[in-house]
From Swiss-Prot:
Protein name: NADH dehydrogenase [ubiquinone] iron-sulfur protein 4, mitochondrial
Pfam families per the UniProt record, alphabetical: NDUS4
Family per record: Belongs to the complex I NDUFS4 subunit family.
Organism field: Dictyostelium discoideum
Record InterPro entries: NADH_UbQ_FeS_4_mit-like, NDUFS4-like_sf
Record membrane topology: Peripheral membrane protein
Keyword field: Electron transport, Membrane, Mitochondrion, Mitochondrion inner membrane, Respiratory chain, Transit peptide, Transport
Coiled-coil segments: none
Entry GO terms, CC: mitochondrial inner membrane; mitochondrion; respiratory chain complex I
Gene Ontology biological process terms, A to Z: electron transport chain
Function summary: Accessory subunit of the mitochondrial membrane respiratory chain NADH dehydrogenase (Complex I), that is believed not to be involved in catalysis. Complex I functions in the transfer of electrons from NADH to the respiratory chain. The immediate electron acceptor for the enzyme is believed to be ubiquinone.
Quaternary assembly: Complex I is composed of 45 different subunits. This is a component of the iron-sulfur (IP) fragment of the enzyme.
One annotated GO molecular function: NADH dehydrogenase (ubiquinone) activity
Amino acid sequence: MLKKFLISSIVKPTFQSRIIASTTLNGGAGRATFCSVNSINPNPTASQIKVDQEDLEVGEHLVIDDPNQQHIKSFLNGVEFNGKSVNIYRPSRNTMQTGTLRTKKWVIELPFNPKWNDRLMGWWASKDTLNQLNLRFNSETDAVAYCKEIGLNYNIVEEDVTLRKKKKYGHRFRYRGDLVGEKEREVGIN
């Protein structure tokens, strides 16, 4: 049995076509899968909300409360957001794979309630459904504009950039001359 429903408490009525959640119920066991859909306009928030360079800096950002959006910010899907902020980051590459497909989009991770442990079986669970939901955006600017429109405080996490240094193997194969009982010291090799 497949049911589709719209998460109306997470977005404003103008953006209800963006986030669709589908829940699949298999024999009493429920599995929820979420996806983001930008069907009307691929860049809906960038043209409406102005994002400055200060908004894109790494660190915590507080959005000024608007009386019209206070109810959206304080409650989201039945979860209280008092003082909590969302994380905006670019996911890192999986260490088991060499591909970078899932590292190109920016992700908004919503805060969730702590999990509890069932001591008998050792299961970890939570009644919070927001830990299953990640919103993906094409750019950091779109993600920040979305948070500013909804009125959520956000925290931009710094990107992990790996710099590859050129490896030098030539010092291993150079002629060292005749070594008679002396150890040669390799000098100036980085």
